[in-house]
Amino acid sequence: MQPNVETFIGCDSSYRAASIVLYGAPYDSTTSYRPGARFGPAAIRHESYGLETYSPYQNADLTDFDVFDSGDLELCFGSSESALADIEARAEEVLKDGKFPLLLGGEHLVTLGAVRAAVKKYPDLHIVNFDAHADLRDDYLGARLSHACVLRRCHELVGDGHIHQFCIRSGDRAEFEFAAQHTEMHKFDFTGLAELTAQLCESKVPVYLTIDLDCLDPSCFPGTGTPEAGGVSFLQLLDAIRTVTSANIVGADLNELAPTLDTTGVSTATACKVLRELLIALDKGWPGFQV
């Protein structure tokens, strides 16, 4: 792996020394409303240099840890299956090397490629999802590989009771009916996350964390393809990240920043800060991981 010309701030470790490997999937070909998430990874890297590596929230510095930024994958925008296969291959390589794969999207469909790799190594995988949308449609306009269907496709891999969703405030009736039978859905906020995390810690099951940034309220994060009013605050998301990363997290992703949809740059700055805090929270917990 070769580093990108411009890496995320503080992610300057070599691949050999790294415990976490950051890789980008600039893909948004199934976006159903406003495109632009393909530009998210590059924008986050570029704007990160306006951010300190030190986190006053966690009293830790990114430079205290070993993170390697491998840059973006070259993905075929005309083929979702091809793009997912490339994402899966990179995640599988990182997992095989005993490292933690952290995927930077892109639209939420990219999660499926990473989960495919994770479930090969961890058949008992659980998924924790922070999102405004249920993403449980069986198809969207006839397409089964869509960001509106990503958690439904993940459910086909991990089964009932293994998907735990938070902040959900949008979806059609069929999605909510499906969730009532097959997933654990917490609407609107992070109520129940502490209790779930305690259960996951006690059972020591492997957990994949997927964060769709549209879980945030659009008043602080308007730069996303499908904004939904009524979301959580940055501090609520940070608290949730610090809570859930005490579980046995074995892979993660951060997705759905569409930087061109917020010309103020606030959304990109927020995404940078979320990524910094996520990296630190994950790396602080690394000795407890069962990779």
Q: Can you name each region flagged by the protein language model?
A:
Residues M1-V291:
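Conserved alpha-helical scaffold segments that buttress catalytic/binding sites
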